[in-house]
Amino acid sequence: MGAALTASPKVLACSSQMKQPVKKDEQLPLGLRVDHPNVNSLRVVGITDSNMTKDLDPASSWARQEELVVKQVVSENIDKLACSLAETEDPTNAWRTIFVKPSHKSWTETVIAIKTNHISRQHTRSAVMAKICHTFTDILGVRPSNIRIYDACHGSSVSKNTPFSDLPEGCRIENKWGGSSVYTSVPEPWKKGTGESKCLKYLVDGSVDILVNIAMCKGHSQRFGGFTMTMKNHFGTFSPRPGHSTDGMDYLIAINRTPEILGEMDKRTRKILFPRQQLCLVDALWASKGGPGGNPTHQPNFLAMGVLSPIVDYQVATKFRGERMGWQPNMKTTHRMLTDFGYDESDLPAGGKIIEL
């Protein structure tokens, strides 16, 4: 499980040079909306199904959860979520709508990075990870060795402590994948768009084509809204260090507005040319009010998906964690996940609700 992109060098060639800083007037403007080419970026879908697990054991370890998860039901439900997200009845069509390859590459050549969360004791369940990986290989035709699973901050022992089962043969668990090692520009609101921070090399140099964000559903500091899900998951893509200062929320918003996460921006129109982060999934089969450490406290048997990270986090934080579980977020902070990306509550579809199956 090497940290270097050693397989298929023609496909995965990387530049060793430092990325040139992006000028402030070439950054994504604060409040500018980001759209997926095929999917409503404001649509967040969810499903609750007790049949996804065999028994209740809310505070269980990851190993125990692996025994309890019913993989086939999880797989079928993720297909249902994809259909609802893409607004189609056929799972194959749904996945081909959600995932978009670069025009100059075949699916075989396309490089996928999957950000998992490996801090402390709550981690992605194998059934969820395997379903997404098999979607790429079995439906779209991605070469398994071009799928890379990582956590650049806390991922040194992913392959040892959470050896995801049933992955396509050749799929790579990269652990830290070299860590956050290359400086890149970070836009507003952090440091008024003049700052830089370290990021995963393969996002900075453009080696990765599609980024998938698989997050947990845990509590965290009120500074970040009182929770950690898909946006804060990228504290394991970018260096988390600046995020733990007084302007940490600015940093969290800002790194999720970078080309490294969102995709390359047209310097003239300041629009995203090709979306990089194309799916955000919250694995709340188990979840916790507090965090980020410790075992889960609850077993909601819930999954949620969307294509735009701040919208997914806002909806799951307010509608699922807040309204359903009673874990109210810090709304002053949480509302920025809408407004700093150009949206408001009134823009959300389905009366502002998660679209539940």
Regions found by a protein language model. Give the residues of each.
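N-terminal export signals
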Residues: 1-17
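Extended, low-polarity segments enriched in aliphatic/aromatic residues
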Residues: 18-111, 119, 123-357
